[in-house]
């Protein structure tokens, strides 16, 4: 076969003309330091703040400090096999997490990866973890109630959909129990719940997940967990990942309840990162922007306008106090950001008052306008009565003689405290709360011994379930009380045929 030189040169020319170079230009740098969840890299001159970076071994990092000679990076995940001298490249993207219906019922880490052993999550939708909060004109005022199922909260410090209500108290005072009960009570309320566990033991998170599964609440709940054994960057990111998942539902017209358990541990993780990145420390060694850390998170909870879907995110952030000190730095920061706080008292908890809500220190700044009419009527004076009872109780310790009016106030106060107690994981529908609080405020419990209040409550509910279902139905549908004559007659009838005469 003869080789034609002209043909060969024509073929080569054709190949050269048709050649399409396929190469990807990315800016790369070199890792100059790595340790304790952070790295420094030289050569990433155009990196953006918050940009996602990829290490040589496939791990991800996030640019935090942009300095003149290098970039401070937080490492998202395991950093043990990253070495000095490794290459690192920019992605040009900011961090996003998977979102959507596929996450419901799953337990995920802050990067959206499943940790429950139930396989991959089938969703192709993502949202950035950091997005601007809705503006003033994009919001609506809080007008719908969020029923927690706890008498002490729904009556004294009511929460509305779109509100941020801080739950603050020492360790072991029942903070998590309140949040879990609130999640359980959303069954059938068309709410999606997100429980963000920050810096907790994995065994504790497992217990909470099993509780949710046992009561059928995992069918509408997403659990985001960054356990105590994970690196600080994941603890810092967990709440932002949780609220990004919530925003997907909110902007599609749904209502979400998100629980941050707890933000004290997130602040500690952020302090650790900031000190490792050599940022100047401020009060209690926290960096100067620790207020912004929480404000930009909690401002993303809102009830948005109808143009944006009319959905809402209700936030229950937790703060753990030391020896009941609510004037600590992080505590006062979050109190000033939120729309009210529920203060759980160590003394009340140890005295058997559970939930241990201190009515004097707790307040809801917007939830009152979201209460249903029936609850407003029966719970109107409850807070003041309870506060004056606590005051009187302190005076009675001096042993002075009491007049009849004071004695009556004390008796009513003791019964109020008893009625507001509630066993764990037994949230009450609002119509039952209204009935027992009506019985309390209208004097039906004044002659019942304090030790029998719980039994009275159970038997009253059983009697109403059997004979007075119409009253429950009226409260449910009209959101208002039936006429006083009807309620008085029904409760009197129960008292007459019971052993509480």
Curated annotation (Swiss-Prot):
Species name: Streptococcus gordonii (strain Challis / ATCC 35105 / BCRC 15272 / CH1 / DL1 / V288)
EC number, UniProt record: 7.1.2.2
Gene Ontology terms for molecular function: ADP binding; ATP binding; proton-transporting ATP synthase activity, rotational mechanism
Keyword Nucleotide-binding: yes
Protein name as it appears in the record: ATP synthase subunit alpha
UniProt topology in membrane: Peripheral membrane protein
Main location: membrane
Chain positions recorded as ATP binding sites: 169-176
Function text: Produces ATP from ADP in the presence of a proton gradient across the membrane. The alpha chain is a regulatory subunit.
Record family assignment: Belongs to the ATPase alpha/beta chains family.
Residues marked Required for activity (site): 362
Pfam families membership: ATP-synt_ab, ATP-synt_ab_C, ATP-synt_ab_N
Ranges in coiled-coil conformation: none
Reactions accelerated catalytically: ATP + H2O + 4 H(+)(in) = ADP + phosphate + 5 H(+)(out)
Keywords, in A-Z order: ATP synthesis, ATP-binding, Cell membrane, CF(1), Hydrogen ion transport, Ion transport, Membrane, Nucleotide-binding, Translocase, Transport
Quaternary context: F-type ATPases have 2 components, CF(1) - the catalytic core - and CF(0) - the membrane proton channel. CF(1) has five subunits: alpha(3), beta(3), gamma(1), delta(1), epsilon(1). CF(0) has three main subunits: a(1), b(2) and c(9-12). The alpha and beta chains form an alternating ring which encloses part of the gamma chain. CF(1) is attached to CF(0) by a central stalk formed by the gamma and epsilon chains, while a peripheral stalk is formed by the delta and b chains.
Compartments, record wording: Cell membrane
Class of the enzyme per the UniProt entry, highest EC level: translocase
GO cellular component, one term: plasma membrane
């Amino acid at each position: 076969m003869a080789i034609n030189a002209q043909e060969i040169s024509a073929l080569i020319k054709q190949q050269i003309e048709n050649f399409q170079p396929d190469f990807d230009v990315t800016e790369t740098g070199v890792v100059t330091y790595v340790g304790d969840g952070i790295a420094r890299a030289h050569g990433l001159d155009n990196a953006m703040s918050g940009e996602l970076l990829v290490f040589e071994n496939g791990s991800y990092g996030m640019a935090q400090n942009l300095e003149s000679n290098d970039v401070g990076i937080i490492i998202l995940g395991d950093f043990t096999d990253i070495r000095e001298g490794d290459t690192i490249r920019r992605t040009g993207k900011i961090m996003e997490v998977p979102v959507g219906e596929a996450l419901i019922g799953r337990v995920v880490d802050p990067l959206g990866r499943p940790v429950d052993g139930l396989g991959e999550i089938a969703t192709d939708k993502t949202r950035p973890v950091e997005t601007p909060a809705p503006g003033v004109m994009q919001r609506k005022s809080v007008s719908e109630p969020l029923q927690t199922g706890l008498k002490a909260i729904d009556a004294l410090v009511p929460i509305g959909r779109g509100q941020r209500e801080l739950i603050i108290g020492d360790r072991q005072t029942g903070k998590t129990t309140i949040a879990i009960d609130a999640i359980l009570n959303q069954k059938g309320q068309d709410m999606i719940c997100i429980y963000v566990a920050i810096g907790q033991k994995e065994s504790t998170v497992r217990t909470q997940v099993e509780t949710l599964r046992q009561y059928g609440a995992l069918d509408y709940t997403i659990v985001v967990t960054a356990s105590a054994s994970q690196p600080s960057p994941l603890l810092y990111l967990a709440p932002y990942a949780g609220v990004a998942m919530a925003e997907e539902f909110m902007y599609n017209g749904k209502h979400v309840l998100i629980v941050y358990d707890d933000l004290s541990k997130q602040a500690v993780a952020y302090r650790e990162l900031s000190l490792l990145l050599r940022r100047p420390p401020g009060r209690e060694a926290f960096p100067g922007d620790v207020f912004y850390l929480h404000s930009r998170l909690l401002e993303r909870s809102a009830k948005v306008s109808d143009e944006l879907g009319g959905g809402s995110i209700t936030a229950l952030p937790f703060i753990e106090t030391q020896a009941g000190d609510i004037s600590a730095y992080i505590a006062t920061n979050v109190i000033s950001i939120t729309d009210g706080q529920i203060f759980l008292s160590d003394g009340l908890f140890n005295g058997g008052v559970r939930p241990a809500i201190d009515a004097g220190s707790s307040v809801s700044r917007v939830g009152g306008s979201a209460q249903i009419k029936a609850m407003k009527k029966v719970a109107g004076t409850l807070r003041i009565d309870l506060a004056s009872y606590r005051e009187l109780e302190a005076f009675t310790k001096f042993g002075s003689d009491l007049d009849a009016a004071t004695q009556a106030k004390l008796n009513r106060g003791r019964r109020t405290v008893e009625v507001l107690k509630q066993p764990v994981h037994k949230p009450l529908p609002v119509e039952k709360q209204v009935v027992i609080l009506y019985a309390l405020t209208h004097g039906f419990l004044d002659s019942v011994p304090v030790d029998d209040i719980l039994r009275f409550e159970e038997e009253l509910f059983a009697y109403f379930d059997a004979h007075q279902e119409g009253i429950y139905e009226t409260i449910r549908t009209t959101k208002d009380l039936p006429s006083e004559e009807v309620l008085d007659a029904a409760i009197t009838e129960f008292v007459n045929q019971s052993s509480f005469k």
